[in-house]
Amino acid sequence: MSSLSPLIALSPLDGRYYSKVVALRPYFSELALIRHRVHVEIEWFKALSHEPAIAEISPFSPDTIAQFDNLITDFSESDGESVKSIEARTNHDVKAIEYWLKERMAKNVEVSKVAEFIHFSCTSEDINNLSYGLMIKHSRDHVMLPALKNIIESLVSKAHQLADTPMLARTHGQPATPSTLGKELAIFAHRLQRGYDSLAVISILGKINGAVGNYNAHLAAYPSFNWEKFSQSFVEKLGLEFNPYTTQIESHDAIATLCDAYAHINTILLDLDRDIWGYISLGYFKQKIKESEVGSSTMPHKVNPIDFENSEGNLGIANALLRHLSEKLPVSRWQRDLTDSTVLRNMGVSLGHTLLSYDSCNKGLNKLEANLERIADDLNGAWEVLAEPIQTIMRRYGLPNPYERLKELTRGKEGISREVIHKFIGGLAIPDTEKKRLRDLTPQNYIGKAAELARDIGK
């Protein structure tokens, strides 16, 4: 395979963003798919050799087992090219794996005598569904979950750091009851952790039961053997969950569930990106800058929230693909059609854009600094938010029309100051201790349990 320059790559994942998503290449490149197919074919061959009921093939020697294992661990780009050259003749990618294995092991007497047990009773989808199952499972466990955990840890760290930093909340874009910066970040840490936990426990299913899922060829060769039990053991030893009821293809319901889980996490992350973008726009966050960088080709002053915008854009692409995968993969005509094959090849693309969005979001989070002066200015100009606790205390003591009186005082009014609020409190028929408690309230300290909630996240 010739080296592809990022400058001429069709996909930006293999071009501009190559270095950001390279961790997925061992799982979703063409070479990775071929290697996983080789792995499954070899493991099936070895499993058959260890089964006493299949008398025509005996357990392989340690040297032969080592040779097989080396084919998997040392599988190279050159090996992949050899497989592709065979595929060019056969026009069948999985059959090319079988022929390549026979060629590579032709000089091994043990193997050559029983070479026809390679791909024994298998349909291509037996090999493919297990290969993709391993690719999807391992990419989740070794790449995607750690990347998501990095974001969660960044959010938890900032939530703790900013737990006591009050801010003016906004509902419908308008000033609302204060919170703290830390608590608002803690919300996303909590949401993403729930998504992480759900994603981590999704079992990927696999099958190896022949052309239409009934073990027809298996039973034709060995009619008294318990092929279902043998197949279940094989699938589970690979680390997948066995699906006993399939057509030619594994139904992909578990992969659809996984895609939905990724898409849901991405939707949460999209919400985070947009909220942070908004806080930067309000001036609540500043971004650390590098002197050498440029924010605009014409406006020298610009420091744009490009990391969150990049993340948002890639999340949109990722979710479009993930939703299509989720909706399309469980649907196949009768005992199968081939539409899932080309769609599954884009699993890595969907996760590539997802991983890129994770990287960009986390990069942006690590640039953030709270702009305490700007946040304080907003709070100092929003004494009307204390209408809520005042009318609530009035309700406690049975004062008439508390909500309506505070509405008349504050709604749509300008110039609501500390003095206006304190004058109103002074005229209330409530105990002096309550008046003092209300006078002690400010937009800065009327934050409820926000600080405590922020400090508790991640514990």
Where are these regions (language model features)?
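Amphipathic alpha-helices that form helix-helix packing interfaces
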Residues: 41-47, 104, 151, 155-158, ...
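Short, well-ordered beta-strand elements within core beta-sheets of diverse protein domains
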Residues: 183, 256-264, 389-396
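Acidic, glycine-rich loop-and-beta core segments that form the ion-binding/anion-interacting portion
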Residues: 222-319
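Amphipathic alpha-helical coiled-coil segments and their boundaries
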Residues: 136-137, 144, 185, 251, ...
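Glycine-rich cofactor/substrate-binding loops
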Residues: 2-35, 86-87, 91, 283-285, ...
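A helix-coil-helix interface module used to build multimeric assemblies
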Residues: 2-218, 222-233, 295, 308-310, ...
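Conserved helix-loop functional segments at active or binding sites
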Residues: 161-165, 198-201, 205, 236, ...
